[in-house]
């Protein structure tokens, strides 16, 4: 478990003090894939560097498995760092070493015997799908293959925590998907806690269990990914979600809808089992009201279904209000577009 307890990190730039992280309190449970998302300058990278004391808190403390990391001796901190793997956006591979040599490096640094190094490197090459690339050099590899080497190297010392600093930002969408699947495998098969930072909500959506949203050094929202996606409370979180999920039809479609005499539009959110229940049809039929699905989708998120539909209703206005009132007891519904503007 990683715990940030009221952590603040202040940098002094000339005569000016800058608070990169402000009073952050977070708990990352053992086995979590925990994502921290924010725009540039939000404080994500600084927060990450506090875990292994590459940066030390100005105030507050960071605890790993109940131990205040900031109070460890130099020797104890070195030992703790061996149990924290890191992967980076730009891979940080040694160009003069082979793939096998890069993976072996942290083991040799730790004084591991040659036979153990050879065996461990072979295991890791197989785990990341690069057994045929052992003797290649980084400049012979694709971006995705380089990141696989980075992951294997980070796993070499059998860490219990893996820190990922924008690990997919330099990759194309298909390669990003492959690397995220590999990280999921690392978490699932090896039981490693993963703490990642990103500015891409698609990464959070794909593999994270929980998420914290940062802005201006503060955590402005955090919780499990399903709840954050289906009921965001902060405008910045909503902006990130809109980057992967269009909430409303385009302006062109809305204009055509208005010109065609379409009525008010409502967003109806279905979660879990409700996403497959015939709630709309049964409720509208009961009140002799028509409904039209204008836009939306039903998809899977954290192994649960989530429906986001934009609908209109037709019929007696009083009965429409009865339908809306009944739906409010079962699902989330709100008016999102008024025909009158």
From Swiss-Prot:
GO terms for cellular component: plasma membrane. Its EC number is 7.4.2.11. It is an enzyme of class 7 (translocase). It is found in: Cell membrane. GO terms for molecular function: ABC-type D-methionine transporter activity; ATP binding; ATP hydrolysis activity. ATP binds at residues 38-45. It is a peripheral membrane protein. Residues 2-241 form the ABC transporter domain. It comes from the Bacteria. It catalyses: L-methionine(out) + ATP + H2O = L-methionine(in) + ADP + phosphate + H(+); D-methionine(out) + ATP + H2O = D-methionine(in) + ADP + phosphate + H(+). InterPro entries: AAA+_ATPase (IPR003593), ABC_transporter-like_ATP-bd (IPR003439), ABC_transporter-like_CS (IPR017871), ACT-like_dom_sf (IPR045865), MetN_ABC (IPR041701), MetN_ABC_transporter-like (IPR050086), NIL_domain (IPR018449), P-loop_NTPase (IPR027417). SMART domains: AAA, NIL. Keywords: Amino-acid transport, ATP-binding, Cell membrane, Membrane, Nucleotide-binding, Translocase, Transport. Gene3D superfamilies: 3.30.70.260, P-loop containing nucleotide triphosphate hydrolases. The complex is composed of two ATP-binding proteins (MetN), two transmembrane proteins (MetI) and a solute-binding protein (MetQ). Part of the ABC transporter complex MetNIQ involved in methionine import. Responsible for energy coupling to the transport system. Belongs to the ABC transporter superfamily. Methionine importer (TC 3.A.1.24) family. This is Methionine import ATP-binding protein MetN 3. It comes from Oceanobacillus iheyensis (strain DSM 14371 / CIP 107618 / JCM 11309 / KCTC 3954 / HTE831). The gene is metN3.
């Amino acid at each position: 478990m990683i715990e940030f307890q009221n952590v603040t990190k202040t940098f002094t730039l000339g005569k000016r003090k800058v608070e990169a992280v402000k009073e952050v309190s977070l708990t990352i449970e053992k086995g979590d894939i925990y994502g921290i998302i924010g725009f540039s300058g939000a404080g994500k990278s600084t927060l990450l560097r506090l875990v292994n004391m590459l940066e030390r808190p100005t105030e507050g403390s960071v605890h790993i498995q109940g131990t205040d990391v900031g109070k460890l001796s130099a020797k104890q901190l070195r030992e703790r760092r061996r149990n924290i793997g890191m992967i980076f956006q730009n891979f940080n591979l040694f160009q003069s070493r082979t793939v096998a040599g890069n993976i072996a490096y942290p083991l040799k640094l730790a004084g591991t015997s040659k036979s153990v190094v050879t065996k461990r490197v072979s295991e890791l090459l197989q785990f990341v799908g690069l057994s045929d690339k052992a003797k290649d050099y980084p400049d012979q590899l694709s971006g995705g293959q380089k990141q696989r080497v980075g992951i294997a190297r980070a796993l070499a010392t059998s860490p219990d925590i893996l820190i990922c600093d924008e690990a997919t930002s330099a990759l194309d969408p298909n390669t990003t998907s492959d690397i995220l699947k590999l990280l999921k495998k690392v978490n699932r098969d090896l039981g490693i806690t993963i703490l990642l930072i990103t500015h891409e909500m698609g990464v959070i959506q794909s593999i994270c269990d929980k998420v914290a949203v940062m802005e201006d050094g503060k955590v402005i929202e955090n919780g499990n990914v399903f709840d954050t996606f289906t009921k965001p409370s902060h405008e910045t979180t909503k902006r990130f979600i809109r980057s992967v999920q269009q909430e409303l039809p385009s302006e062109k479609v809305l204009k055509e809808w208005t010109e065609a005499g379409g009525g008010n539009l409502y967003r109806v959110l279905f979660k879990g089992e409700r996403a497959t229940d015939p709630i709309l049809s049964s409720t509208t039929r009961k009140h002799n009201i028509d409904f039209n699905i204008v836009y939306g989708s039903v998809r899977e998120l954290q192994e649960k279904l989530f429906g986001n539909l934009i609908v209109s209703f037709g019929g007696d206005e009083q009965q429409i209000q009865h339908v809306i009132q009944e739906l409010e007891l079962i699902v989330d519904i709100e008016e999102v577009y008024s025909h009158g503007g």
